């Protein structure tokens, strides 16, 4: 039992057993979210350590598909954040994810936090709908699970920033999750799991959308999780129907080919 966990979640294996069917059967793809998973006082301490990533030597994404900031490894983690992230990479939490998701291959954490860690989106920022890169560039493992822990207090729905999960054929959004403080979202990462935060953030100046992201991997994956080929690919972007501001220039052509192949396969 971890001191990071809230009272209702002290027995993670029981939580996983209770919700694994809901996870498996979720639409538009396997996913779930939990509220108040973590001890509020400890999460407050982690929020207090969260830096303004725009003022650090971070990864600054600013193009037609994303406007956001991301940390690089552990370098900007405070001591409490580091302990928390290490817990989310620990055996007990991996066992929880294994049971919840039903993944048969052994899940492996990412000590490098490649593409993960602290994420921040300022007013006007966004992350267009996409499927994730499917291989870890250092470990060579298959990406299987994303975990997102939101740190946004007093977040009004009018601010936007919903985490959107889209159908594989990009015909419509299947689910939306508001990024509220102490909410944890979990979803399976495949070539069919399109997701993002596609519309510009509307929160007031001085606020931002903050989250902690962790990705989990395995050595191999089921063949039915490949939509187009078994080759490694980077993040692939998808255009929403009737969304005039989803213009991806050369990046759009890559994912359009993927979508067309999916439609031909009837997936």
Indicate residue ranges for each PLM-predicted region:
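Non-heme Fe(II)/2-oxoglutarate
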Residues: 11, 20-101
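A structural signal for the main folded, soluble domain(s) of proteins
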Residues: 67-71, 100-108, 119, 123-126, ...
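Eukaryotic charged/polar low-complexity linker/IDR segments
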Residues: 146-148
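Non-heme Fe(II) oxygenase catalytic core, chiefly the N-lobe of the double-stranded beta-helix
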Residues: 48-51, 76, 85-143, 152-154
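A structural signal for well-ordered alpha-helical scaffolds and beta->alpha junctions
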Residues: 12, 39, 43, 81, ...
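N- or domain-start disorder-to-order transition segments that initiate the globular core
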Residues: 1-16, 20
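Catalytic core of Fe(II)/2-oxoglutarate
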Residues: 136-143, 153-267
